[in-house]
């Protein structure tokens, strides 16, 4: 899935859209996405000017954005609905557990986001998320999301 289709599923835009491409996706199971981290990212101006490091919270946000796409597509599949995003639907990041930051992410890295659906209960979707660079784990977390909007899944 390319950037144009990603924009149909996520309301985020520059500079907060943190996914460049979906590599693999199996609804109700997993998603693999990537973010090419460049020296031109606006957050590097202040984090840190002499030693650029991607803020850990943005690595978590990138994982949550991947989870959002997986959640919307999975909810549609579970309900037997067409695989189309809702015009007024939005997916909210509502919780994080067990977050661990293991390595830094720097300009030139390709961040691979691997998110697996754990469960869905009472409108809350739980995901196991992992971010890697060159096969080395940089961040892990359990992420919770929910959807809202008239036509939300």
UniProtKB/Swiss-Prot annotation:
Main location (coarse class): cytoplasm
Enzyme class, spelled out: lyase
Pfam families: FabA
GO terms of biological process kind: fatty acid biosynthetic process; lipid A biosynthetic process
Keyword Kinase on entry: no
Subcellular location: Cytoplasm
Protein name according to UniProt: 3-hydroxyacyl-[acyl-carrier-protein] dehydratase FabZ
Designated gene of the protein: fabZ
């Amino acid at each position: 899935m390319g950037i144009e289709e990603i924009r149909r599923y996520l309301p985020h835009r520059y500079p907060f859209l943190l996914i460049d491409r979906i590599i693999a996706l199996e609804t109700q199971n997993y998603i693999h996405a990537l973010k090419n981290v460049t020296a031109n990212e606006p957050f590097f101006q202040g984090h840190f000017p002499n030693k650029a490091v991607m803020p850990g919270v943005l690595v978590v946000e990138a994982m949550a954005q991947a989870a959002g796409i997986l959640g919307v597509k999975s909810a549609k599949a579970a309900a037997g609905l067409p695989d189309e995003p809702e015009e007024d639907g939005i997916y909210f990041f509502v919780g994080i557990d067990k977050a661990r930051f293991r390595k830094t992410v720097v300009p030139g890295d390709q961040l691979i986001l691997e998110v697996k659906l754990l469960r869905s209960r009472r409108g809350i979707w739980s995901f196991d998320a992992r971010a890697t660079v060159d096969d080395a784990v940089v961040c892990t977390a359990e992420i919770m999301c929910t959807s809202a909007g008239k036509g939300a899944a």
